[in-house]
Amino acid sequence: MEKIHATTVVAIRHNGQISIGADGQATLGNTVVKDYVKKVRKLMEGKVLCGFAGSTADAFTLLERFEEKLNTYAGNMKRAAIELAKDWRTDRYLRKLEAMMIVVNKDELLLISGTGDVIEPDNDILSIGSGSMYAQSAAAALKKHATHLSAPEMVRESLSIAADICIYTNHNFVIETAVA
């Protein structure tokens, strides 16, 4: 059976704001099965935001584990991310999960992968999913040449450019901005 997957998630820090957004399309093989899937979630009363790409069931499993880690470590996002990455890499069950996550708060952007990586970007941009390279390229250009835009506006424009190019990305966006 084919998996439901494919998406674009992008996060940007710009002028003191951090925003994250994702498109809403879910596909099964080469067929669109749903136009609006919410792939960005608020955690810790909106203080932490999480975007995910990959197998939906796997992503939700990881999201639940990440939320548990956030609670265990009193909202310390970086510590929770590192502990999740350790578990993800070493646990026999979790190791088989096929998803990636971007987590953000008012200060940090982190990418968490199943290979045990927790990556903090040098350029204040992270992206995952099928249209990630289009969104990341657009975000880099916007940060360099459209500095008057806010972080949420840059996320929207980056996703829009990715959706124009990537067949697995649509224009139904959910965009959130981290709060203090």
UniProtKB/Swiss-Prot annotation:
It comes from the Bacteria. Allosterically activated by HslU binding. Its EC number is 3.4.25.2. One of its GO terms (molecular function) is threonine-type endopeptidase activity. One of its GO terms (cellular component) is HslUV protease complex. One of its GO terms (biological process) is proteolysis involved in protein catabolic process. A double ring-shaped homohexamer of HslV is capped on each side by a ring-shaped HslU homohexamer. The assembly of the HslU/HslV complex is dependent on binding of ATP. This is ATP-dependent protease subunit HslV. It comes from Cytophaga hutchinsonii (strain ATCC 33406 / DSM 1761 / CIP 103989 / NBRC 15051 / NCIMB 9469 / D465). The gene is hslV.
